[in-house]
Amino acid sequence: MDNSQIENTIIDIRKRSGAVTTFNKDKISNAIFRALAATSKADRGLADQLAENVVNKLVEQGFTSTRTPTVEDIQDIVESTLIDSGNSDIAKAYIVYRHERRKLRDEKMNVLNLKTLDPVSKKFDLNCLRVLASRYLFRNGKSEIIESPTQMFERVATLVGIGDILYDSQIFDKSGNNPQDVDEAKSYLEKLDAFDYKFKVGDFFFNKWHFRSLINHYVDLANKGQMKIGFKDVLTLLAGKKLESYADKIQEYFDLMVAQDFLPNSPTMMNAGGRLGQLSACFVLGMDDEMQQIMKTTSDAALIFKSGGGVGINYSNLREEGDIVASTSGVASGPVSFMNIINTVTEVVKQGGKRRGANMGIIEAWHPDVEKFITNKTEPGVLENFNISVGIWEDFWHSLVNTDGNYVLRSPRDRKPVKEINSHQLLDLIALSAWKSAEPGLIFFDQINKYNVFAKARQAPLRATNPCGEQSLYPYESCNLGSINLVNLVKRQADGTYEFDWQRYEETIRKTTRFLDNVIDVNTYPVEEITTASKDSRRIGLGVMGVADLLYKLRIPYNSKEGYELQSKLSEALTYYSMEESVALANSRGEFPLCSKTEYPEGKIPISGYYERPKETHTYEWDALIEKIKTHGIRNVLTTTVAPTGTLAMIADCSNGMEPAFALVFEKRVTVGRFFYTNKIVEEVLKENNLYSDEILAKIADNYGSLRGIAEIPQWMQDTFVTAMDIHWSDHLMAQGVWQQWIGNAISKTINMPYDVTVDDVKSAYLLAHELGLKGMTVYRDGSRHKQVLHMTSENATKTFDVVPSLHVVQYVTDNITN
C-alpha cells in the first residue's frame, strides 16, 4: 500500500488522553527501530518494512478515516506483526519497550500530579521532571502541584515578554520628555485580583502578578519621562489587540526553554508570575563595622534567602577578634562570629524548601583574623551554609617574590599594622586547608579589577562575589543569570558526523541577551537598595552549559589543543554577540544609567582577551564594537559569566557549565533526593561500536567512571570521552583560563584533583591560576569533604590510571612561565 492510499484510509489516531492527532507511519517505524536496536539489529530498512506491514494489518482490521485506531490498537498490532514475521526476539524487546514506556508515563503523571501528559511533559526526561516538580512548579496550600511544566514555562515567558511590550514605539520614547501621572498606574496595585487573567497577548494571559509587573515597569519608565501615554491607554492597546505582535516574542522565549536551548537561573523559573516575583540568583551585600549596619545586612540577607537568592559578603571591614570596642570598652568578637549569625539565618530561612541557602564569606589576606578564617571549615559542621574564600590583592603576590616574604596584617579599624607573617606560610596554610576540606577558595581581586570599567563610576574596586564566585558585584547589586545549552546547537551531517551551528549560536545569544535584560525590568527586588543598584548597572550574566557533551558529540577531547581552541572561540562569540546586542538595546531603549560615568566612553572594555591576546588571533571585530559603544552606549555594564548550572543542567539534560563530565556513570545527591545518571552520548557510542553491555558498564563504574585503561575500549574513545578525573588539574586551570579571557565577569569551575595530590600541588595550582589570568579558583581533592554532591555509582570505584598534563599545557608553561 502506497502512502497516498494510507493517507486516504487512515487519517487520524486517538491518543490516550482522548485527543485526536494526525496519523504518522514514521512513529511506528521509529518505535520498531528502537526495539531492533535493543537486540543489536538496528536496521532502518527492516523497521520501515515492518511498519508498512503494521499499516496493512490496520486496514485489514477495518480501521479507516471514520474508524480511528487508538494508540493501544496500533501497539497491539505491532506486537502481532513482529511475531508473525518470525521476529520473536524483536517482539519481546518491543513488549518490554512498551511496558517500560507505560511505566514511564505512569511515573511522570505521578510526579507531576497529572492524569495525562502534554507534549512538554512527554519530551522531558523523568529526572528533569522530578527536579521541576520538587523546586519549580507552583503548589497550593496543601503542597499539591497545581501547574504543569508547560504552564510554568508559559508564566516565565509571559513575564519576560512584558519587558518588551512597554518599549513598543506606540508607548515608549527614549528621550524622557513625557510627563505622566504615575499615581494612576499605582492605583491598580490595590485591585490586582480584578485583573487576574483579564488581559492577554495572543494566547498568553497575564495573571495578577504579571499585571503587577506591568504596572511597576510602567511606573519605572514613566518616572524617567519615557512613557508617551498613560497607563489606561496601555490597557486600551492591550484590550484592542494592538500589541498582539508581542505574542511572537513570548512564544520565542517559551520555545527557547521548552527546547532546552536556554534556561534562566532558578529564581526566575520559581518566582516569575508568582507573588514573590524575585528573579535574580546573585546578590552581594556590604557589611561595615557598625552594629546597625550589621543587623540591616542580616535582615536583608534573610529576605534574599526567602526569595531564592544567594548572598556574597566581604567581612574584611569588621575589626579583628580582641580589638577594642570604644562604645562599650569591651573587645570585638571578630568577623567569623558574625558569619555564624548569617549562617544561622540561612538555616532558619529555608527558601521555602526549594533551595538550600547559599553564602560566600570573604576575608582579605591582610586581615588579622585571616589565619583563623582559613582553617575555620576544616572540621565538619562549621558554617555549612557558606563557601569561604580569601581575597588576594597585588601586595600579596609582591610579598611572595620578596626575599623575606614578609606580609603585614592590618587592622580594619585604622589600617595600622597588627603583625607580620610570612606570605609563603600563609599560602601554605590556605593550600593545606583546601587540601583537607576544599575550603577556602581564592579570589584574585587584582585580576577582577584589572579591566573593571565600572570602578570609575562607583569610585571603588569590586570586593565581593556571589556564592559560587562567578559574579563580582558591588554592595546591593544583583545579577540574573541564564545559560545556553551548547550541545543543542550541534547539527548532524549527511555522513553521520556533527558540526556546531555558529549561526544558531549567534541568534540564540542575541535572543537570550534580550531575555535577561527584560528580566531586570520585570523583577521584584527584595530590598529597595537592590532595586536601585541593579538598575544603575543592569548587569546580566549570560553563560553556557553542555560544553563537555558538545565536545563528546564533535569527538574532540576536552583537554586537547583543538578542544581549547574551540572553547576559546565559543567564549569569544558569547561575549562579542551579547555585547553587540546590548549596544543595540542601548540604541533603542537607552544605555544603563551610570554608563557615561564609566570607562566605556573612553573606549575601554572589561574583556582581558581584547588586550592580552594578539589581535590577529581575534575572531571578531572588537575595535568596531568599541566604536559602537562610544556612539550608542551599552545597555548592560557586563553581559557574560559562566555559572555552575548544577540544577539547570539536570533540567536541560546536559553537562554542567563548562565543566568536563564528572563521570560517565554517577549518582547525584541534591536537596530533593538521589538521582542516577549515565552519559547518553557515550552510551550511544558504545552501542554503535557493539561494546555496550552490563559487564562494560560495571568496568566503567569500577574505574572511577572513566573509560581510561579498559582494554576493550578503543584508544580513540579513551582519549575523547574524558572525565574530570581523567584531566590533570593544570588542564582544568587551562580550560578555565581559555574561557576567562573572553568572559566579562568570572567563571564558576571546580579544579578537580585526585585523592593522592600533595599540598604542594595545590599551592602550584594557585600560582598557575593567577598566571593564567583567572579571577578566582576552587580546588576539590576527591574525598576531602564529608558530604559530596557527586558520587560514583559503584562503591568499588577505583582509579587504575595515571593523569598527566596535556601536551598543550606543557607547551604553554614552557613558553610562557619557565622561559
Where on the chain are the PLM-derived regions?
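Extended catalytic cores of very large enzyme megasubunits
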Residues: 1-819
